[in-house]
């Protein structure tokens, strides 16, 4: 999918795709990048709104990850395809509950308490948004999941973790929760 991007053109993705052994050819053509290298050479451009750099189109969301490298926050692109894939996985996980005993089938009609980062994302100058990956995924949850979703928009937007937990504790007695879910840390 990225063959027509700057990255795909530079590293000759077409050659890899046409190769008898595409995976091996890809490894030969594309050097390993650490975060600083890929950010400086590629991803930094996308923060300025440049499209088709390392993935087709413009990047609208960035997951922020603090790390051990030079940057205080690492900006990691979150593509539309990743968000779509996440929506499909929501559905798969819910449908997988059907295979289990009667208690789990009843739980399918109950709420999902999603514990994660704030959905109140930081807006960048080129129109993109950045925040915790879990906050992005919660904000971009599928429309059909809204009915089951707790803690709700107001509480989910809170960036102060202690305040968020206090609000959840205060309101949880009124929710019919069958599942507690979250996004694993990096």
Could you say what each language-model-derived stretch is?
Residues 1-64, 70-185:
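Nucleotide 5′-phosphate-binding alpha/beta core
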């Amino acid at each position: 999918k990225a063959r027509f991007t700057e990255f795909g053109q530079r590293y000759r993705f077409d050659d890899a795709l046409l190769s008898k052994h595409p995976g091996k050819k890809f490894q030969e053509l594309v050097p390993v990048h650490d975060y600083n290298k890929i950010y400086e050479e590629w991803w930094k451009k996308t923060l300025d709104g440049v499209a088709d750099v390392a993935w087709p189109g413009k990047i609208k969301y960035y997951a922020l990850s603090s790390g051990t490298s030079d940057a205080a926050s690492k900006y990691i692109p979150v593509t539309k395809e990743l968000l779509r894939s996440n929506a499909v996985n929501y559905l798969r996980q819910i449908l997988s509950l059907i295979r289990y005993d009667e208690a789990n089938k009843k739980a399918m009609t109950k709420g999902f308490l999603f514990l994660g980062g704030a959905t109140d994302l930081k807006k960048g100058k080129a129109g993109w948004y950045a925040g915790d990956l879990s906050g992005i995924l919660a904000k971009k949850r599928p429309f059909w999941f809204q009915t089951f979703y707790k803690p709700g928009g107001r509480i989910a937007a809170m960036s102060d973790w202690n305040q968020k937990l206090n609000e959840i504790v205060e309101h949880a007695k009124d929710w019919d929760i069958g599942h507690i879910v979250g996004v694993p840390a990096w």
